[in-house]
């Protein structure tokens, strides 16, 4: 029986990119008029993205979800500010 891999990754070129589930907060807005009660009800949405980590530094995380198996070409790309990421 084949053993399950501990971490899912993709090898593109000679580099491994690891797959993550990223929980992050998306700011929400409304351009209409609102009273105090409606204003306090406005909360950010908790979003979940599943993607490979391309790179990260102390301020940002770059991800991709699709890639070309023949060349280092990436699609479905995002750049997340670290301040909105709640869990990886």
What are these regions (language model features)?
Residues 2-88:
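Conserved RNA-binding domains used in RNP assembly and mRNA/RNA metabolism
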